[in-house]
Structures are given as C-alpha cells and as structure tokens.
Amino acid sequence: MSASGVLSFTQQGWEQVLAKVKRAVVYLDAACAESLHWGCGSTRLLEAVGGPDCHLREFEPDAIGGGAKQPKAVFVLSCLLKGRTVEILRDIICRSHFQYCVVVTTVSHAVHLTANHVPAAAAAEMEGQQPVFEQLEEKLCEWMGNMNYTAEVFHVPLLLAPVAPHFALTPAFASLFPLLPQDVHLLNSARPDKRKLGSLGDVDSTTLTPELLLQIRCLVSGLSSLCEHLGVREECFAVGSLSQVIAADLANYAPAKNRKKTAAGRASVVFVDRTLDLTGAVGHHGDNLVEKIISALPQLPGHTNDVMVNMIALTALHTEEENYNVVAPGCLSQSSDTTAKALWEALLNTKHKEAVMEVRRHLVEAASRENLPIKMSMGRVTPGQLMSYIQLFKNNLKALMNHCGLLQLGLATAQTLKHPQTAKWDNFLAFERLLLQSIGESAMSVVLNQLLPMIKPVTQRTNEDYSPEELLILLIYIYSVTGELTVDKDLCEAEEKVKKALAQVFCEESGLSPLLQKITDWDSSINLTFHKSKIAVDELFTSLRDIAGARSLLKQFKSVYVPGNHTHQASYKPLLKQVVEEIFHPERPDSVDIEHMSSGLTDLLKTGFSMFMKVSRPHPSDYPLLILFVVGGVTVSEVKMVKDLVASLKPGTQVIVLSTRLLKPLNIPELLFATDRLHPDLGF
C-alpha cells in the first residue's frame, strides 16, 4: 500500500491497453494522452504498436481513418460512450478499412448504466453483465461493414496522470470546480416547483444538475478503482459543499460494496473544496521553481498540466523572431528517463534556489560522464551559465540521446529564469505582502483604492504594469484572503470605481485575450461597448463577493488571515495546512468542519446510537494512508507543504495528494469567471 501506488495503478491500466495495440492505429483523446504522458510515455505505446509507421492519432471529428493496409484500430477514451463520442467513433470507422476494433473507456459499465437511466435496483441485478458495451460491440461490427469482424469494448480505469510517487492529477476532470452561492440561485431557478435552497450548505446529490452529477459519478468510479488497487476500504471525509457530494457518492458507491467487505487495508479519503481558499492558488509566495516554470512557459497543446520547452538551442536552426512556432517542443514529464525523473522529483520538493543549483549539478555531472569540455563556475546560477552547459551536448548525438530528459528540464529552467514573467513574480509577491499588512490595518475600501492607480489602459502600460488578467488575479487574492465582508457605503463606492476602471480597460485593449473574450462574451474589443463591458465586470464582482463569503458556512476554518502584532507581520495561513493540522491534532478532537460521510444504514445507526452510547466515529487520522483530494486544482507548493506536514505531525503515515489539475495563478480566473460549473460538457 505504498504511496507509489498511484504510479503502479496507472501503469497497470496502461499495460492492459498496450496488450491490445500491436500493429493497430491508436486513437487517444486528450485526457488519456495526458495519463499516458505522465504514466509511461508515448514511446512505450509506440513500442507496443510496433511496425515502422507512426499510428498514433488524436480522437477528434476530423481524425484520419485507417487505410487499406490498416485493419486494426484501438480507441482509448476518457468519456462515456454516448452522444458525440459515439458519433465520432462511427464516422472514423465508416471511412476506414478496419476489421478489428477495440474501444477502451475509462468509465465503468456501472456508470454507463446510470447514464442510460437504468434504475439502481435493475443495475444491481446485472452484475457481471455488460449490455451497454455489448450493444456498442454490435454497432462497431455494423459500421465496419461485416458482423463477423471483431469488436471489443471494455473498461480500464485510466483516471490518473501521476506527477510524482505521492501526487497525481485527474486530467478528464480539469474543469471540475466547486460551486459558488450564485450557482445556488441558478439551481433554484431551474427547479421552481421544488423547495428553495437557502445556501451552498443545502446542496446535495438530489439538487445538482444531471450533467454535474454524472461527471461526479465518473470521478467516483475511478477513485473506487484506485482504492481497489491499493487494497483499502476507505472512510470518506469532506470540507466544503461540493466535496461533501463527492465524498458521499464515494462512500455509498454501490459497485464497491463487495470490495469494501474484503479489503485488507484502511484509508481516509479527505476531499477539500478549492474555493474555500483561493489565496494559495493565485498567490506568489510559493518559493518553487516548478510553479514558475508552469506560469512562464506556454502550455503543451492538449494538456492541462505540462508546458512546451523550446529545444531550438540544441539544433542547427537559428531564428531571430520572437513569436515563431515551436515544432517539436520538450516538456517536463520524463516518465521513461530515471535520471530526469529523479531531478523532476527533486524540483517538486525543494525551494527555488536549491532547485536551480540541483539542475546545474545534474548538467555538470552529465557533461563530465560524457567527457564534454566543461568549465566549472561556482556562485549564483544564471540562465547563461545553464545554457553554456546545455550547448556542450549540441553536436554530440550520443550525449544528446543519453541525457535528453535532463536537457529538457535544464532548458525549461534557463528559459524560465530569463522570462519577463519571472521578474514580475517578485512584483506580485511584494504587492501581496503589502496587501496583507493593509488588510489588517484598513477597511476593504482602502485596499481597493490602493489597487485603483494600477488599473491602466494598454496605451499607458509598461512591462512592469499589470495586465487585465493579472489585475483579476490580484482581486481574487484580496477577496479570498479578506474573507467575509462588511458591506457598507464606502465599500460599494470603492468597488464601483474599480469596476468602471476595469470596464474601460477591457474596452481599450488592442485585442481581447481568450480569457477576456469568454468573460465579456465578445471576441473583439473594437465592438465592445463600455455598457457591455461594465455588465461583465459587475458579474465578476458577484463572483468575488461569493469568494469572500466562501468560508462563511465553516466554523473552525473561517479565516486564512493571521493578523500582525508587535513581533510578527500579518500572514496567510493556508486552509490545507489548517485541515492537515486538525486531522493530526494529538488530542483527536471531533472536527466540526471535516465532515465524515456515512456509508449507508450501518453508519447511520452508529451515529444514532452515539447520541446515547459511547460509539466512536471514524477519524481521518485513524488509518495508515491519507488520500487528500483537492477539488478544483492544487499548486506544487501546497503538495510539498502537505507532504512535509504529515511527515512531521505523524511520521509513518502515507499521504497521497490528488487533484483535478496542477494550478498556476492564471487558471483561477478561467475556472472562476469563464467556466460553466453546473453544466460540464459530457458530449450529449
């Protein structure tokens, strides 16, 4: 039951897929490609396919079909086999010459029954049967044009993208984000004849939209498979309203009943809503190199958790252009290179300064092993120094091949260190520290007035100034760290000034970024009127007020702000830190905010008896394994903090951190202001 179970779980799943792909054309969707990328790498898949041709394709409507000499196809899909997915499958197969089709879905058959509205009682009677998959197998043969051809449909739980032995992400759920009070109003308006929900505290599985509920069930199915792989029976806990729905669904997941009876090990699974603390998600206090890399470098296309590393310095190409396209980028994930993987894990677990020195050490050692003419230099590590070491490998193909993974991480580091965004990181940090002091000494209106002069139109901005998206990051920081607001005349006036300034800036942008296009619902600033811009900004501030009140339903974790005194400056105390400290509190108090989710009648009876008998309820520190799942994304610094904290508070306890995505500050405005949280796109 080691923490590296997240890696073996993923690799075991991929081995089942690889057993099917020999000489096949393989179609992957983005989330499965990301799981492969972090789990075992595309090279492993290509080796399993064999043959000289590259038969790897993206699963999309315009995907190229299989030619006359390509009789076999394998589709690896992270979604329900329904609606648009089935239509794309049909179209690809109909324009191909396949005689053998395998479809692998990461969603279990039980969830397919739920999606097809099969009642729970009827589904329970079908144990061992897979009618949905069997019907699709018939359809596949029909589309191939011969009922005697071969079709297979089966489930493999490829839920995770393992970033480190103790840390994994769920790419298929990257847009899953906890609800806000404004979503409660939307839920109420969609069910006018039912009891009105008063707050997020009233939200449960019976009140959510069918799409969101089904998305949660898909996640729960994958988590149940993970617990089965780890050999544990889980006790589920939650902090936050959406986390409660997910935890309750996992605790009562019917297909897991038999597994739980026979499991030898035990584990606590604690879900936490990201919205309860967005300060940590948008803040720049994390002294971590990887956080800076994922913020500075462009995203790897189709991925949510990796970046493009420009490899041109290792080629004979020369370009003076600033914005040329990177044809064959490097990346951070080095799943099949043990040395690079060791460096990557060191970067995740060390502070910025040590991490940069570690990169230099690895480059120097690699160059020495290859007998390259290295000039040693001590002192501060500079991007130029790293580049000079990397350039040594340029004309030595063998050395390049031997250390390709390491060179990608080295280039990522050098490119980040000299990136203008990294210099700005320190500006953010300084302003955030200033804000923390101001919040303790002044009213919110004064803090907003401090921000006002920083809101500048594009014609007046220098590289030092904040872009509209960066201003949104600062606003989220301010509202999240402040917490519940006292709404008075001064606050309303200060907010109105900031709103007008922001709306004007949006109108005057030379071109709207993809995020601003989503926020304003307009694709060009030329046609964006001040009136329309102001309506969009008003909606932003509704979300900001919601974020300020996000912890209002909590009793214990009400604040992430620690006021200053004579000896200490004001500071931010992460909610995750408070939760982990509470879990491992030596006196094991019954936490009011970490809610235990009972699984069925037995637990309810226990809870009932406990009112007049001494029945101990499960506590999250009871078991040797803690799985902490942050719903809505997590930062590298937070993962390190949790790992270090558990090791110091209860040595010997294993911890696995899971989350929907790896966060950089700019992800939060997207998830908060430009994502339909209630209606995820399931493709039907």
UniProtKB/Swiss-Prot annotation:
SUPFAM superfamilies assigned to the protein according to its UniProt record, in alphabetical order: Sec1/munc18-like (SM) proteins (SSF56815)
Keyword Transport in annotation: yes
Keyword annotations from UniProtKB, A to Z: Protein transport, Transport
GO BP terms, alphabetized: intracellular protein transport; vesicle-mediated transport
Keyword Protein transport: yes
Entry similarity comment: Belongs to the STXBP/unc-18/SEC1 family.
Stated role: May be involved in protein transport.
Name under which the protein is recorded: Sec1 family domain-containing protein 2
Species in which this protein is naturally found: Homo sapiens (Human)
